[in-house]
Amino acid sequence: MIRSVVRGIGGALPKKSLSNDDIAKFVETSDSWIVQRTGIRQRYIANEKETTVSLGVEAAQAALINAGLTIKDIDCIILATSTPNHTFPASAVEIQHALGMSHGFAFDIQAVCSGFIFALTTGDAYLRCGTAKRILVIGSDTFSRILDWQDRTTCVLFGDGAGAAVLEAQEIERGVASDHGILSTKLRSNGAYMDKLYVDGGPSTTQKTGYLRMEGREVFKYAVGMITDVVDECFAAAGMDSSQLDWFVPHQANKRIIEASAKKLGISIDKVVITVDRHGNTSAASVPLALTMAICDGKIKKGDLVMLEAMGGGFTWGAILIRW
């Protein structure tokens, strides 16, 4: 049978970091206030020359090197982003060109913070049906460009960054020791909650980009239940449960949400990858960046059972179970 295997992974961050103390210089907040409520200590902010595309290119190049491949080996690029360089064309096409790729195809997916989960699931489907052999899946966002920097409830939460994975179709014998790759995926969305987390602008309405707006307490109220339900569904689809898990890689939005979700799922905090303290919420880049850090730190190893999950505006949410 065909399995989608993560062949390589990489990440990219802007050059400039912004600490909680830095933010406290221009908005009424403090390091202790932010850390206590979110777990975030710093985030990275793109400069004028750094964009969703440039960060995406950097992450893609790192993933290709990690995979031992070149852009000539890639058939498709899927970019998850909510902050494209232009309304159109798709930023994925710009990344395709910047990488020197003129074959195959590229397109964007928009599912906010769940974007990488949606993109990886789409890539998995393309590989299993034979549309492509290798796909470059990227999550890249520059949320600093859509933040109201006078709103202390949102500007402290987000950072910029990109992460990428090379997904490859491999013939796998199911049930044997070498059986690895994506085992199950589950995606969900419900537009009834769109007013809980959104951007108050757009080309078809205000003709302006707008700013990110969020009802933080409402998001927290729904997040843990939605996340844990979809993770349980993902386990069930693969005939497994949380006791078999080696690593839990959640969306890095808020440390309290991460800890509450892990507790409800019965996953030891020692098995949870947490990078929100270093990066803040990088939206679609969150999960691949956390994966990259976990691999660089020597945590995730070949054969490990890894659960990815994310939740974003919409609401959108999803989970992916992978045998590394």
Curated annotation (Swiss-Prot):
Pathway stated in the Swiss-Prot or TrEMBL entry: Lipid metabolism; fatty acid biosynthesis
Known catalytic reactions: malonyl-[ACP] + acetyl-CoA + H(+) = 3-oxobutanoyl-[ACP] + CO2 + CoA
SUPFAM superfamilies in the cross-refs: Thiolase-like (SSF53901)
Active site: C113, H251, N281
Gene Ontology terms: cellular component: cytoplasm
EC number(s) given by UniProt: 2.3.1.180
Record bears the keyword Cell membrane: no
Region (ACP-binding): 252-256
GO molecular function, one term: 3-oxoacyl-[acyl-carrier-protein] synthase activity
Record key words, sorted: Acyltransferase, Cytoplasm, Fatty acid biosynthesis, Fatty acid metabolism, Lipid biosynthesis, Lipid metabolism, Multifunctional enzyme, Transferase
Subunit structure and binding partners: Homodimer.
Domain description: The last Arg residue of the ACP-binding site is essential for the weak association between ACP/AcpP and FabH.
Biological role: Catalyzes the condensation reaction of fatty acid synthesis by the addition to an acyl acceptor of two carbons from malonyl-ACP. Catalyzes the first condensation reaction which initiates fatty acid synthesis and may therefore play a role in governing the total rate of fatty acid production. Possesses both acetoacetyl-ACP synthase and acetyl transacylase activities. Its substrate specificity determines the biosynthesis of branched-chain and/or straight-chain of fatty acids.
Family: Belongs to the thiolase-like superfamily. FabH family.
Protein name, UniProt field: Beta-ketoacyl-[acyl-carrier-protein] synthase III
Source species taxonomy: Bacteria, Pseudomonadati, Pseudomonadota, Alphaproteobacteria, Hyphomicrobiales
